[in-house]
Amino acid sequence: MNERKIGILLSYLNIALHAIVGFLYVPILLHYIGKSEYGLYQLIGSLIAYFSIMDFGLTAAVTRFYTKYKALKDKVGMENILAISLYGYGGATALSLLVGIVCYWNLDGIFGASMTVGELLEARQMFLLLLFNIAVSLSTMVFRSVINAHEKFLFLKGLETVQLILQPALVILILQKYPTAMAVAVAQTALNVGLILARMYYCFAWLHISIRFHYWNQELFHDFKKLALSVFVVTLIDQVFWKTNQIILGIVRGTAAVAVYSIASLIYMNYMALSTAISGVYLPHITEMVAQRRPIEDLSSLFIQIGRWQYYLLALVATGFIIFGKQFIHLWAGNGFEDSYWITILIILPFTIDLIQNIGLAILQAMNRYDFRAKIYLLTGVLNLVLAIPLGIKFGGIGCAVATGFSMLMGNGIVMNYFYKKYIGLDIPAFWKQIGQITISVGLCLLIGYGLDRMLPGSGKIAFLCKIFGYTVLYGVIVYGIAMKSEEKEKVQGIARKFRRNG
């Protein structure tokens, strides 16, 4: 099994672990630190997350150009691009610290109206610690890019598995004595520093990388800057979508509203990870395809093929959440989080369009055409911000979700599909024809599943798990029998045979 397949499998293992740990972890956090402290932790985390984008797209650019030189067996180019990127990361780290200090001195003015004196004091302490965490991460991000470019996904994803298991265990251990949001931040920072040291050791001891400045290439710098800034703009707008709504709610509604929105956020971020688990390991492969000048038909075929598999999985989760989501949130988070269901629905449905097409983003990066995505995403983010503020004031979290869902539908859906077809040459009509055919089976599953849920008695945890299992089997049978192509069925059968042999 090659590293790419291992990377995909480990990504899904990590998603499952993240979901399981998260769904167990959040009630434990709420139990130890309470709703307000949890909301405070999410609020400061949302604010500090903006500093993580200050790599200015360097990570994606390093992966792309390092992979290109690696494919061409240009050792000097590989060493040179790492040296240049380290200067960039150093500047990004310094800038993030400068901006962070300015924000720190203005925290009282931003949140003074919605926080108590005690909450503000703890918020300042958490902000400084998490700012340090971000600075350490930014200055060493190049090592993650190198491991990704070498497609060493067993190590890269394995570290993520370790983090998923150790972090909640460490947090719970600390909360026994110090039940505060600050204690959670301390545990996260300590573990993050340890993992960074492990990645650095792997790069030098196992990959034997060398970082050395050889020459200045103006054309390379122009291409590098174009991709890096494009990725930076997209990452910035990602923060608008996924973090700004919580900050708006923190200002106009307080920490309790942030906690409700954060429950929905945890669900739709796990939903997003189901898609990016596949596309995230394909950038080096697609970069090699583009470098080898493979025809656009090959890229279009890959775009449709991966999109179908992503849709099979995402449609299962989306329809399952529509049917069972209210009961799930009640069993998981308890009372007071009813709006989280509608917030999640309003976001994941339009978001699905973008998620089943995110191989297209890797294609744009490999072609260095990502600047259009950045421009459209910028306009989409502005639209989201303009809509989210008044809707958040009037309707709370649901209003913010409406703004985000509508903005994604317009920008990530309609406009990006036009660009893929018109300027990249991907066969978008064929893509949507195939997705439409699958949707017939998905709709049938939704109707049958909803009817069975209404008819079958039981609302406890055991009954809930049985319904989830039953719906998953129903979905699998219908989609396999009606929607899947023969070659897709053969892949499923091949996986089943491997499981039987291993069993």
Which ranges hold each PLM region?
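Helix-loop junctions and terminal segments of transmembrane helices
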Residues: 56-72, 149, 207-208, 264, ...
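Membrane-interface junctions at transmembrane-helix termini in multi-pass inner-membrane proteins
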Residues: 4-5, 134-160, 172, 179-182, ...
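Interhelical loop/hinge segments that connect adjacent transmembrane helices in multipass membrane
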Residues: 1-4, 121, 181-182, 199-242, ...
